[in-house]
Amino acid sequence: MDLGTLQLRQSNRKVLKKEMIMSVARERIVDCNSETFSQNFNRLPHEVHHALADHPLFQLPALAALAQQVANRKNPHHPKGDLYCDQGIETNGSHAGLRDSRASIAELVREIEKGKTWIILKHIEREPGYREIFENCICDILDLAGKDVVKSIKWFEAILFITSPNRVTEYHIDRECSWLLQIHGNKDIHFFDRADKDVLPDDELERYWVVDNLSATYKPEYESRALVFHLQPGAGVHSPVNTPHWLQNGDNVSVSLNINFQFHESEWENLFKANYYLRRSGFRPASPGRRPLVDRAKSHAYSAVQTIQRRVKGLPSVTANEARQDYYRIVEMLASRGPR
């Protein structure tokens, strides 16, 4: 064999090895038909698929340990802690044990099948192992959405839901743009059109953005308008900002991972805030979208007032340092990834 042939074969081996490495690196956790995704991103709910159903970090023993880690955080993201636990016990009309003792949370996870419990673990991306999964999920999603979307994002989060059989999650709306990935068990999620004013009137959205996270009210007479997704392990669904929904767990333990991000204050958000104060002052503001020029003026005026208030009060205009570090790390990861 001459030297030229040998060098060519060695070069081919290097190219093949590089292609294999890139192929492994591009193996996706979250995926969806690109056309479906681009048409519906932050507009309409749609199904996605994921590869986490058999991952060891999402088995109950690992989740019990994770719950204990989250409960014991010395610097939680939220002032009241990053763990929420509702055991479905009512005393005199109010829920008891909404935030269970830190000592018993791991046991609650292990015994989840026997109760009526709903456990939420927030910002699990702060824990080793889960961080890498979360970052890859976000990068997969942003590959589909278009990498420029990251410029409009304020922060990212991974939330884990562990739910007892047959538990219902009440009707609500969220300010985050999210993807719910079903890992264990099955559940139905009922979505409603956020543009349907019968289902979600303007005043409910206005109160939501300003004073009341629970302002959205379920109206059973419109249940027939719901778009229902039946989630099994390996399936997921996209929930656009402010899309009303409620969930019904199946007759088994459900483990769901919610990958979400929150956009910077948008004209849309500020418009509802401006309309809230106008309505309180006795005006009857037009629904967003009917008078675009007026909408834009109100939104910009509200944004300017908020900026002045932040400066007067000395409030930060960016999120916590750790959240910003997560953001920049994801931006770097996106830049290093090749095309789909």
What is each of the regions a protein language model found here?
Residues Q182-H238, T243-P244:
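Double-stranded beta-helix
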Residues L16, M20-C139, L278-F283, Q309-R310, ...:
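Transition-metal
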Residues W155, V168, H172-S178, S224-R225:
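A short beta-loop-beta micro-motif enriched in histidine and acidic residues
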Residues V228-L231, F263, E267-R340:
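Conserved double-stranded beta-helix
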Residues I159-I173, F192-D196:
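Conserved short histidine dyad/triad with adjacent acidic residue
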Residues H230, T243-L257:
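Ligand-binding loop in jelly-roll beta-barrel domains
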